């Protein structure tokens, strides 16, 4: 039985209420943190994966990391001199782009910059990013790492994945003697090539984590000095 228009409106209202409550929660948390910690750092965390975010939160357990979109963070910080919650904190707003994190801490700027200069995580390349290296799957039996390691250190890819390789990833594979095989080498991507969704999925399937995730530091606010300092860490 089709849903009535009324039920759809109720569902939409519930969704809007939840979104509004989340924005209000972030607003309150930001202002409370501004009253608690001396420094506020703008971390650019576009496309950050959940395990990475959890690791950063764990490493900075004595501090507070709040994630949010620019509009929400701008409202909490105050985007102008007239609306800013703390003197000159509105200067941070222009540094917030896309999905950002605000790290509230009492650790010194030297400690923060040293940590994030060194922090990096191997990551899978995403669609629309550039391929970090040339990847070609050798002809013959298809191994789980796709030729990245010697065959004696690898295992053949399980035969149940053959339909996925052939139908979803469009690789010309077939089953021969119970193993997935390629008659010819299969080029996945050239180094520097812009990846599409299919190529990114193939790289992930074969465990090619050659990309690198780094946190970009844009600026920080010092509550005692009431000043914003631009730092530009990992912005290259």
From Swiss-Prot:
Q: What is its main location?
A: nucleus
Q: Which Gene Ontology CC terms are recorded?
A: cytoplasm; nucleolus; nucleoplasm; preribosome, large subunit precursor; small-subunit processome
Keywords for this protein: Cytoplasm, Nucleus, Ribosome biogenesis
Under Pfam families, the record lists:
Ribosomal_L10, RL10P_insert
User: Does Phosphoprotein show up as a keyword for this record?
Assistant: no
Q: Where in the cell is it found?
A: Nucleus, Nucleolus; Cytoplasm
Q: Which GO terms describe its biological process?
A: nuclear-transcribed mRNA catabolic process; ribosomal large subunit assembly; ribosomal large subunit biogenesis; ribosomal large subunit export from nucleus; rRNA processing
Q: Any idea what job this protein has?
A: Component of the ribosome assembly machinery. Nuclear paralog of the ribosomal protein P0, it binds pre-60S subunits at an early stage of assembly in the nucleolus, and is replaced by P0 in cytoplasmic pre-60S subunits and mature 80S ribosomes.
| The protein's assembly and partners | Associates with the pre-60S ribosomal particle.
Similarity-based family: Belongs to the universal ribosomal protein uL10 family.
* Name by which UniProt lists this protein: Ribosome assembly factor mrt4
């Amino acid at each position: 039985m089709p849903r009535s228009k009324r039920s759809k409106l109720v569902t939409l209202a519930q969704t809007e209420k939840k979104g509004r409550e989340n924005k209000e929660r972030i607003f309150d948390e930001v202002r409370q943190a501004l009253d608690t910690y001396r420094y506020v750092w703008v971390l650019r965390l576009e496309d950050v994966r959940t395990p990475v975010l959890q690791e950063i939160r764990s490493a900075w357990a004595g501090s507070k990391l709040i994630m949010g979109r620019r509009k929400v963070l701008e409202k909490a910080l105050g985007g102008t001199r007239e609306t800013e919650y703390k003197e000159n904190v509105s200067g941070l707003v222009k540094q917030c782009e896309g999905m950002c994190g605000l790290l509230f801490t009492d650790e010194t700027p030297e400690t923060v910059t040293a940590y994030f200069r060194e922090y990096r995580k191997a990551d899978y390349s995403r669609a629309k990013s550039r391929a970090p290296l040339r990847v070609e799957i050798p002809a013959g039996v298809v191994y789980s790492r796709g030729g990245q390691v010697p065959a004696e250190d690898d295992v053949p890819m399980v035969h149940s994945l053959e339909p996925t390789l052939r139908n979803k990833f469009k690789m010309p594979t077939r089953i021969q003697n119970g193993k997935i095989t390629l008659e010819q080498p299969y080029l996945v991507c050239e180094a520097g090539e812009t990846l599409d969704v299919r190529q990114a999925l193939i790289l992930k399937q074969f465990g090619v984590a050659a990309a690198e995730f780094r946190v970009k530091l844009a600026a920080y606010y010092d509550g005692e000095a009431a000043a914003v300092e631009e730092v530009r860490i990992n912005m290259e």
